[in-house]
């Protein structure tokens, strides 16, 4: 596990498409120190080797997974009822005081003691979700599955969610080729249709709030549910904000590969969203046909060394 902090404000640093560090909070940019670069490359290589081994089915998946988790860190929490929760985690990310831990079978979100109401707001955002009676695409799997809440001894609150197999934060994968950004875009267009059906503005669609499985092309809008706006003050302007954010995300994840994208894809990403998510999805379908030659499963290249 690695955690790179901004020397200016203490926020979590991200890695851009050119391999430099930047801070989402204060905008500071910097380069890796030699020791940080070695640590980052080793960690990333371990993750990608594990994913490659699973994908190619040429290696013992169990041993690959054990190798991956051999370098995991451990964090412990004392609960108010006198129990201890100890978790091994591969990755952590802090955003606006909320720390997310990627464990083997779960994803944990820890809210600060002085802001525990944010945990309740987070869950309230999820409770606003509703799905069509005939959910033929099983879209419920594109959203977090809540497992439990734990009140901690120090006043913090821990929320636990299910982590499906081989699901990782999108930010972990760096710059992606256009065909991979496109399948992520397809999943997010589906997700935005659910948000509109539920009359929700999410407000936080970005590389750390979206988790993906690169083998099944599955995506989950996991994070930032406390930023949702409910059906009581919902308008079509709100759904267009969701659609603008997914366009910004697609451009971000392509990074240095953006110049390789079909012109139809780039034109769509730079265009204003349609009046609603359903019309926007229809427009996106035309981009898939005209820009990529139709829908097909593209094996994700995991060689990001």
Go through each PLM region and give its residues:
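Short, cysteine/histidine-rich loop/knuckle motifs that typically chelate Zn2+
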Residues: 5-8, 25
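Short Cys/His-rich micro-motifs in 6-15 aa windows
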Residues: 26-37
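Juxta-kinase regulatory segment immediately upstream of eukaryotic protein kinase catalytic domains
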Residues: 39-89
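ATP-binding glycine-rich loop module of kinase domains
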Residues: 73-139
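Conserved structural core of kinase catalytic domains
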Residues: 141-182
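Conserved alphaE helix
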Residues: 179-191
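Catalytic-loop of the protein kinase fold
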Residues: 192-214
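C-lobe/activation-segment region of protein kinase-like
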Residues: 213-305
């Amino acid at each position: 596990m690695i955690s790179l902090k901004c020397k200016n404000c203490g926020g979590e640093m991200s890695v851009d498409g050119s391999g430099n560090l930047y801070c989402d909070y204060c905008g500071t940019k910097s380069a890796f120190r030699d020791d940080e670069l070695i640590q980052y490359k080793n960690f990333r290589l371990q993750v990608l080797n594990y994913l490659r081994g699973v994908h190619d089915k040429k290696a013992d998946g169990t041993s690959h997974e054990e190798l991956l988790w051999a370098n995991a860190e451990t964090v412990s929490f004392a609960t108010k009822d006198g129990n201890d929760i100890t978790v091994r985690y591969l990755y952590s990310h802090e955003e606006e005081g909320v720390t997310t831990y990627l464990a083997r079978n779960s994803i944990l979100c820890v809210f600060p003691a002085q802001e525990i109401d944010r945990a309740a707001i987070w869950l309230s955002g999820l409770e606003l979700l509703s799905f069509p009676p005939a959910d033929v695409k099983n879209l419920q799997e594109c959203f977090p599955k809540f497992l439990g809440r734990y009140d901690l001894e120090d006043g913090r609150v821990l929320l636990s969610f299910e982590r499906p197999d081989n699901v990782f934060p999108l930010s972990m994968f760096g710059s992606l080729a256009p065909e991979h950004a496109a399948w992520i875009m397809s999943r997010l267009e589906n997700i935005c249709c659910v948000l509109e059906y539920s009359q929700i503005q999410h407000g936080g669609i970005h590389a750390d709030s979206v988790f993906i499985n690169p083998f099944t092309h599955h995506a989950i809008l996991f994070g930032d549910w406390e930023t949702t706006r409910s059906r009581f003050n919902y308008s079509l302007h709100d759904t267009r904000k969701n659609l603008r954010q997914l366009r910004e995300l697609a451009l971000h994840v392509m990074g240095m590969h953006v110049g390789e994208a079909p012109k139809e894809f780039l034109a769509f990403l730079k265009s204003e969203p349609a009046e609603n998510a359903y019309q926007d999805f229809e427009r996106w379908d035309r981009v898939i046909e005209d820009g990529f030659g139709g829908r097909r499963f593209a094996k994700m290249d995991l060689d990001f060394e």
